[in-house]
Amino acid sequence: MIATKGRNVVVVGTQWGDEGKGKLVDWLTESAQGVVRFQGGHNAGHTLVIHGVKTALHLVPSGIMRPGVKCYIGNGVVLSAAKLFEEIEALEKAGVELRSRLRISEACPLILPFHAALDVAREAAREQGGQAKIGTTGRGIGPAYEDKIARRALRVQDLKFPERFARKLHELLDLHNHVLTTYLGSVAFDFGPTLAPYMADGKVLFQPVFDEAMRHAQLLKPMMADVSRELNEAHLKGANLLFEGAQGTLLDVDHGTYPYVTSSNCVAGNAAAGSGVGPGMLHYVLGITKAYCTRVGGGPFPTELAWEVEGTPGYHMSTVGAEKGVTTGRSRRCGWFDAALLKRSAQVNGLTGLCITKLDVLDGLKELKLCTGYQLDGELTDILPMGADDIERCTPVYETISGWSDSTVGVTQFDKLPTNARLYLQRIEQITGVPIHMVSTGPDRAQTILMRHPYLAD
């Protein structure tokens, strides 16, 4: 039976993001009373398809599409109020009532226009200097986390006190404008139409940033909350909570393909720190894993295929899987499933179970390859090394598995899958040591195979 009191589930991506977490979070909220975002910012994107209608979310937790479910943005999230209200207005136009159900931690650091300007200028300076781009979304996520770690960030709670906000903003602009103009040479860069209203001569201006922040303050005040307290109280009252990770494990600042990573911890352990609950409140960790691998932007990718070449398996994955980033629209690089990578993700997340997504994309491929390990400096290793430098030197070791021609689209029972599709999934379980509890066979809520429900009591 489904637990009726106080069972909490963490959903994390196990690859480089884009694994299909949004659909599964939406599916699981049928059994939850609250959904929590605990890290990242509006650099992450989730696409939900409900009754054939696509909805893209970047900051608002995916559970907002379920009437009556409370949604929380925890202290681990860096918040662009401008982007949040763009999203709120779009959802309200679509008929989703959410302001009374959305709670935002007062401890969230704010993303402000100078953070995005720093992001853009740094990538431009790297390119100008002949260095490889990190592949950021240019939305100010990294610089906002830098201010947090340096203990100088403006936080949501500062918006309640205009004089305090103005003083801190002046201090931050003095610092960041010096970096922009003197170190990065920002006068020479084109910052685009989004940042133009806030800038002059390569510097970010005080008044437009302050005025916009004060407008947002009035709108945010009804949603500001002590999220840590509210989550703990909800748990004590028996609510089921769902903690929604953004991006993926291999983008984690500590455990990912450093330095080609994001600026936050994407692993399950951060669900506690990023929302203000104790680790004992996290009962089940669901790892979302695409049936093949994709990656957006730069960085090592051991099993990458020639996904731009027509007629190849990689091209099949790219086109059939519609592999374009939700946030940036960039094409995702595609490759074979990497079980050695998944072993690393299982280790650092403490996965309870797996959900394999986009299995249907592999329909029609005659044969599939599974990476079981790598050759690294003449030795065989069965788990992904730490950091980009070692991963770049890895040569994948593959097993070949026969594909299937029958469609898996919309299949809702495991034993109704083609035989080779079942063998493929079972081999993933064997290599990684993590049981598969769910399989997604299409983008809609109903296109799901359930073997064990994460909210099922132990």
Curated annotation (Swiss-Prot):
Pathway it works in: Purine metabolism; AMP biosynthesis via de novo pathway; AMP from IMP: step 1/2
Any GO MF annotation of the entry: magnesium ion binding
Annotated compartments: Cytoplasm
Top EC class of this enzyme: ligase
Keywords: Cytoplasm, GTP-binding, Ligase, Magnesium, Metal-binding, Nucleotide-binding, Purine biosynthesis
One Pfam family in the UniProt entry: Adenylsucc_synt
InterPro entries documented for this protein: Adenylosuccin_syn_GTP-bd, Adenylosuccin_syn_Lys_AS, Adenylosuccinate_synth_dom1, Adenylosuccinate_synth_dom2, Adenylosuccinate_synth_dom3, Adenylosuccinate_synthetase, P-loop_NTPase
One cellular component (GO) term of this entry: cytoplasm
Binding site for substrate: V326, T327, T328, G329, R330, S331, R332
Active site feature: D18 (proton acceptor), H46 (proton donor)
Family matches, as SMART domains: Adenylsucc_synt (SM00788)
Record text on subunit structure and interactions: Homodimer.
Family, per entry: Belongs to the adenylosuccinate synthetase family.
Name of the molecule in the record: Adenylosuccinate synthetase
Organism, as annotated: Albidiferax ferrireducens (strain ATCC BAA-621 / DSM 15236 / T118) (Rhodoferax ferrireducens)
Lineage, top ranks: Bacteria, Pseudomonadati, Pseudomonadota, Betaproteobacteria, Burkholderiales
Gene for this chain: purA
